[in-house]
Structure formats: C-alpha cells, structure tokens
C-alpha cells in the first residue's frame, strides 16, 4: 500500500500527508491505510478548489488554461494540509475580516463566494452515515458539509453542492480510479474495512457562565485569563529537561530530579504495635464443615433443611463454655446466643412441617449482639442546624498493628488444593459465539488447575453468604433471621456434597443507601484452639461446644470442637461485590492469559497446550525472604487466584491506597532493572503516601512485607 500511495499521488500531497501523520505520532509505513486516506482527502480538497476563481465583479468563474488574469482571486482558501498553528491563524484572520462565526474544529476550505467554511468528507462507507457523523461532530449550522464516496455518491448540506456538475464529476472519477487501482493490487478490501467513525474531540470547547467563572478562579498563579493559560498550554513543548519545565510553570516549584540508583530505595517501614487480628467476614483456613454426601432428604436445597440435616451428622455436642472471651464484649451473651440457636433448631424439628426460614426470638442477648436500639437517633438537619456547638463525633486514630505470621499462613492455605471440586466447568460461562477453540482450551486447562483450590472454596462460600444475607436483608427487614452458612461441592468420586460452616443471625436491615450497615452475628465451627494465637482472634468470643472424632493414621482421636462467635456488619454495596466474587476467577484467568500470549508471541504460535502440559518448567510466583519463589503453572494459577480472592475478602481503603501508591514505586524499580535510568523527585513524599496506608490491616501489611522482599531481590 505504501508503494501504491507514493506512485499514485503527487509528491507534494504525499509529503503533506507524512507531515500530518508525524504531527499525531503516526507512522505512514505502519498505518498505510490511514496514509492512503489522508492523501485522498488532501487531493479531493485541492481538486475542489482548482480552477475556481472570483472575477472583478465578484462572480465565480472557471479558468482552466493559461495564465489567469491577475485581477482574479482564488474562490477557495485551502486550510487542510497546513500545520495546525498556521491553519488556525488563517481561520482566525478569515473570521476577523469577514465576521463569520469561528468554527470549533479546523475546516478544510473557505468559500469566498458563499462566505462559509466547508468540511470535505471522503468515505468508504455510506455517504449519509458519514454525513451524520460529521454533522454530529461539528454541530455547527454555519459550516457547510460535502461528502464524496468511492462509489460516485455524494451528499451535501441542504443538497447545495457548491460546485458545478463537471467539477464534481472530475472528483468522482478520480476517486473511482483510485478504487480500481487499489482493487487491481488487492488493497481495496483492507482499505475499505479500515475506516473508523469520526473521533469527536472538541477542538474549541466554549465555556460560559458559572463554569467560566470557576475556570478563571482556578487558574494557576501568573495567568490573567483562561485564554492566555490555554495559549501557554498549547505552546508547551512536552520534551526536554523536566526541571526547566517545572520552574517555567511556577516560581514556587523547584523539583530537583534525583537519579534513582540501586542504593536509593529503602524498605517500607511497617508499623509496630500488637499483632494484627483476623477481620474477614467469615473464617478461612480455620473453618470446619459438617457435611452430608449425596443429599437426597426432603426439602434438599432449602438452606434450613440442609443445615438441620448437616447438624444431625454430628453426635459430639456438649454443654458449651467460653474458652477465649472477647475483650470488650458481654461474653455470656455470646454463649446465650449459641444456646438459643440450638434450642430454636430443636423447636423446628418438633414442628409438623419445617418452615423454609427461621426468625429468631428477639431476646436480650441477640438485641445486644445485633446492636438493636444502639444507633443514635437520626435527627433532621433542619431541626438542629441552629445548635451552636454542632460538630461531628471525635473519632480515634486507628491503633497501629504489626504484621503477624498468621496472615501468610492464611495465604499459603488459600493456594493449596482441597480434595473437592468447587466449581463446575460452566461456572465461567459457555462460549456464546463460535469463539476460538483456543479460548475454551485455555479456560478448561485453567479450570482444571483451580477447581479444587481452597481459594475457589472461599469464592463459593463468599458468594453464598453474601447472596443469602442480601436476600434476607431485603425480604425480612425487621426480623433476626437465622441464615445457615452453606457451600456445595463434589468429592473426588464425583458425589455431591453439602457443607455447613455455621450460622449467621441478621439484625434489622432497613438499607436505603448502598452504605447503610446491617449488623449480623456469625457463629462458625472450628477445630482451631484460639489460645494458640489469641491475637488473631481479638474480635471473637470462642466457645467450646463439642468433641469431634477424627480418623488419623494412628486411629481415631477426639478433638475439641470450637465455635467462633463475633458481631460484624456489612452493607448493600459490600454484599453486591461479595456476590460477584466469581470475577476473581476471571481476573486471574486473564493474568495467566497474558503470560501465555507473551510466550506465544515469542514462539509465533499458540503455546497454550505446551504452557499447561510441560510439567518440568517452573515459573516465578512471588518474592519471599529466601528469594524468588518458583512453581508449576498450576501453582501460579492458584497463587494469582488467591491474591485476587484476598483482595476481595480483605478489601479496604488501606488496600486501595497501598496498591495505587506502591505501584508507582514498583514501576520506578522496574525501570531501574530495565536500565532505563529513572529519575525521581520527592521520593520521600511517595514513601509517605505508601506508608500512611500501613496501619493495621493484615493483608496490606503482608503485601508490604512482600514488597520489601521484592525490593531486596530486585536491587541485588
């Protein structure tokens, strides 16, 4: 195509087109269709104006041969093909001398006879579609639009075609010739299909009224008006020495660009303080399930029926007692709450027909645990705006916490395989379109690697709990509904299994806004003795509620069974995201896909099969104090999934801030590793921004400690 363009068009046109493309950072050698389109458009603009003059009487005449009379004036001013600054200068001077309204976009021509700007369009599509796009883009009554197509059709504003029949025929013939020449070289199809719609970037966006006043108020120092600030910005050359640029911007800024060397960065400072505690909405590695295989009982699938059936599989219940109190709570209330659940479940069984849902009696212990009547009364602002000392509550700074080892163990556990499958293949959605075989193949390989992963169990558990809680919050706003925490899976042998982790009791839930909070009490089974890591369980009251017989290599052993109880809260928006946790599968699949793509582009063929089936190859997984950890491709899939799942389970403002700010430092370090000689200013400020997010969140603290390991190894 490039050769064709150079042969087919006048060298002056080719040169102008190259210049125009370079001005927008485009390469004529690469974007050859665009190159051809620009040349065609330029040629049509020149042909439009050729031979058209205005005589001394102001009439328009056509002079095709010889030296025209010196008194003749060109009918059209050509704006297209000039560089932007020059083009705007011409437009401004025309507007000043003729009083014509200034266009928002650079037009192509000015017609001195009709006193109007003209926008010329050349399209490979339907003329009326292109006409509408142009009209929509320029939104000006005053600019005349004239569209030509390669098929000989044309369309103009109000069907006013400006030129005589013959001049237009000349343009149409030329376009038809270009099309035939392209077709004979096999270039036409690609050229025809490459046309994109009009980009609607406003050149001159007029600001008026309040916005104009705000714009004038918010100008940087030393600028008197929006116009001269705009002129300054337009004239700002983006390359060159940064220090000079900054001092040119403002006298107050003196940023010294410091070279960023291997010795420059220091590790992030992690906070001191008591060890951080568990803050997830449900237990992760410490959860215990009561399960039924191949459920076929009456009402199977109704959560309450399933829960009762699961409870009946356990025979080691005993009189509950508190083994780890909650520091601040009224612990006997937690104990009473569990006893109430047991009693009310027993009541259900004594009924003729088990109900589908169970609302708990509003006892003292539940009212306390669910914060009933605890919220301060809401008062309308109108009624209290005259109160002289009206102010917001003083809130305490959050207490700093140090990194504890349990969160790394939680993460390691999330990456492990369980002996059950937690997603069916269609969980990620069937192919709708006959989309490449490759996509399905990747999905199937990926699913095989993660379907048994514990992080996938957490996804399904999270989806279930959040869905059930949101449903109950809307359907039974005033009730203390008992919600079983359930998940479903398949065993190695393919048998269905229903699991009960414990129960949630929901408080009052009149959720008007996305952020309105619903309180709930969670009660979860576990075999973990809380006294081993009491700091992890700071927010929980833990009861011992039974003894469980476990099969081990040496035979049966009896272990105490615990119940982890705490009050917690969530909101509509958090539940909505919790319900969509399956997205984590998609996110990690996309990350794996980009690894496959990188590999495939090097080898110039699809490497999906090799990628998943070459068991000998190891891949980098992450950094630890020991160095770069490596593992199989399956391990990489599961690690990426676990990270995505933990980002969802431990979502917080601290995580948002840390991710955004630490990424900047990460990019600088990567630039250093790639020998790009990065420079920085105010590195201290960046460290401050990162470290102000390191307060007490276990997942953020763990990520910060991983970041430090990365720094150490990256800069060796």
UniProtKB/Swiss-Prot annotation:
Chain positions recorded as Mn(2+) 2 binding sites: 80, 108
Family matches, as Pfam families: Flu_PA (PF00603)
Protein name: Polymerase acidic protein
EC number: 3.1.-.-
PTM (free text): Phosphorylated on serines and threonines by host kinases, including human casein kinase II.
Chain's role: Plays an essential role in viral RNA transcription and replication by forming the heterotrimeric polymerase complex together with PB1 and PB2 subunits. The complex transcribes viral mRNAs by using a unique mechanism called cap-snatching. It consists in the hijacking and cleavage of host capped pre-mRNAs. These short capped RNAs are then used as primers for viral mRNAs. The PB2 subunit is responsible for the binding of the 5' cap of cellular pre-mRNAs which are subsequently cleaved after 10-13 nucleotides by the PA subunit that carries the endonuclease activity.
Motif (Nuclear localization signal 2 (NLS2)) on chain: 184-247
Classification via InterPro entries: INFV_PA, PA/PA-X, PA/PA-X_sf
GO molecular function: endonuclease activity; metal ion binding; RNA binding
Family that this chain belongs to: Belongs to the influenza viruses PA family.
EC supergroup of this enzyme: hydrolase
Binding site residues for Mn(2+) 1: 41, 108, 119-120
Main location: host cell
Cofactor note: Binds 2 manganese ions per subunit.
Any one biological process term the GO annotation gives: DNA-templated transcription
UniProt-listed Gene3D superfamilies: Influenza RNA-dependent RNA polymerase subunit PA, endonuclease domain (3.40.91.90)
Cofactors (names): Mn(2+)
Gene Ontology CC annotations of this record: host cell cytoplasm; host cell nucleus
Subcellular localization: Host cytoplasm; Host nucleus
Keywords noted in UniProt: Cap snatching, Endonuclease, Eukaryotic host gene expression shutoff by virus, Eukaryotic host transcription shutoff by virus, Host cytoplasm, Host gene expression shutoff by virus, Host nucleus, Host-virus interaction, Hydrolase, Inhibition of host RNA polymerase II by virus, Manganese, Metal-binding, Nuclease, Phosphoprotein
Self-association and partners: Influenza RNA polymerase is composed of three subunits: PB1, PB2 and PA. Interacts (via C-terminus) with PB1 (via N-terminus).
Positions of short motif Nuclear localization signal 1 (NLS1): 124-139
